[in-house]
């Protein structure tokens, strides 16, 4: 049921990803102008990711009706399939952000969605079905939800679950999101809808990220007061300056509880680029650039934390083991599950972007 109040009025807040999770949602990829070769390689990768997460917690996958049978064949029998229409398969951004209160009750938020920029720089023209997905998911899992009065995607925000929110100016202040709102007004809306006390604004996201710099591709919150940050030591890499800007902001701030923020540098893979074969397998589109030789916005920070497990993208044989080692040292109590996920990267994101956790 759609509510007319706000989370702040009702005492609900945004919990951290590393807190207990009851289920994880994905959507089944099919767009031929985003996923190569009729989306078949992407479907294989999505299925592998969903099946591995299903060994840890309940998994639900939204699928359009014409792909139901194929998805059912590829997914484990304990993965629930639900027919929900959508325009593309980025559940982090089109699904609900689910809040909790002190009594353990849950409520969702249906953000307004405009395909990462609307008429200004959106990636496709028709996002009407995407904009309804969050409400549908809330109805299916049986929770009430708020309809937020502004545009936001789940990949644009990270939290420590203790009052601190991390985001980027590049995304939230983009003219394609909420040009009618000032930065101060956006802060106020985030506090009202997410129950947070402090917002840490990083200047930019990852280089060439077509979401206008989602924070979940740049960094991840792995514990209260502790983050991993995508990093390169190559001065010729455009990301070199961007990561240092982000680190300087993080070093200069304290979180909502007054803690200094511990930063773990997580090296970037690559740089990685579209191959000619990969680019040629994607249908032409006016909104999405998929050209041979174009740099991919690749990051190991785009992982998912679920109940003591980290589902980590594997992207480059030269750096995969380094990323695993750094994360395992930073998160010794977690089991890291490494999953080759280049096919998700080719579509413009990675494991965190295609999943949305529901708090327990």
From Swiss-Prot:
Keywords: Hydrolase
Pfam families xrefs: PAD_porph
Active site: residue positions: 353
E.C. numbers: 3.5.3.12
GO molecular function, one term: protein-arginine deiminase activity
Organism: Vibrio parahaemolyticus serotype O3:K6 (strain RIMD 2210633)
Endoplasmic reticulum as UniProt keyword: no
Signal peptide: none
Protein name: Putative agmatine deiminase
Coiled-coil region list: none
Reaction catalyzed: agmatine + H2O = N-carbamoylputrescine + NH4(+)
Entry similarity comment: Belongs to the agmatine deiminase family.
Database matches in SUPFAM superfamilies: Pentein (SSF55909)
GO biological process, one term: putrescine biosynthetic process
Matching InterPro entries: Agmatine_deiminase (IPR017754), Peptidyl-Arg-deiminase_porph (IPR007466)
The keyword Transmembrane helix is assigned to this record: no
Highest rank taxon of the organism: Bacteria
């Amino acid at each position: 049921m759609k509510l007319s109040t706000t989370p702040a009025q009702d005492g609900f807040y945004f919990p951290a990803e590393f807190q207990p999770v009851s289920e994880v949602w994905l959507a089944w990829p099919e767009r031929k102008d985003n996923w190569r070769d009729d989306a078949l390689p992407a479907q294989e990768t999505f299925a592998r990711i969903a099946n591995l997460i299903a060994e840890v917690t309940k998994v639900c996958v939204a699928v359009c009706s014409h792909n139901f049978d194929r998805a059912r064949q590829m997914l484990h029998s304990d993965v629930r399939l639900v027919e929900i229409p959508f325009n593309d398969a980025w559940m982090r951004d089109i699904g609900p952000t689910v809040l909790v209160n002190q009594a353990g009750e849950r409520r969702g938020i249906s953000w307004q969605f405009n395909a990462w920029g609307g008429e200004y720089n959106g990636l496709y023209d028709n996002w009407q079905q995407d904009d309804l997905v969050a409400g549908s998911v809330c109805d299916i899992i049986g929770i009430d939800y708020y309809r937020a009065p502004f545009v936001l995607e789940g990949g644009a925000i990270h939290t420590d679950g203790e009052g601190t929110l991390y985001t980027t100016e590049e995304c939230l202040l983009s003219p394609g999101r909420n040009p009618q709102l000032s930065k101060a007004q956006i802060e106020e809306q985030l506090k009202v809808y997410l129950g947070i006390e402090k917002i840490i604004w990083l200047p930019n996201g990852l280089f060439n990220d077509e979401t206008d710099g989602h924070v979940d591709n740049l960094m991840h919150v792995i514990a209260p007061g502790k983050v991993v940050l995508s990093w390169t030591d190559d001065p010729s890499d455009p990301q070199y300056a961007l990561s240092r800007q982000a680190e300087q902001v993080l070093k200069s701030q304290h979180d909502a509880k007054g803690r200094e923020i511990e930063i773990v540098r997580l090296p970037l893979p690559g740089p990685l680029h579209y191959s000619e074969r990969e680019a040629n397998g994607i249908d032409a589109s006016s909104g999405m650039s998929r050209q041979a030789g174009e740099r991919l916005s690749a990051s190991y920070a785009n992982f998912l934390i679920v109940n003591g497990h980290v589902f980590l993208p594997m992207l480059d044989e030269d750096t995969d083991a380094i990323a695993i080692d750094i994360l395992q040292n930073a998160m010794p109590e977690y089991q890291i599950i490494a999953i080759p996920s280049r096919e998700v990267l080719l579509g413009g994101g990675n494991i965190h972007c295609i999943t949305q956790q529901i708090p327990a």
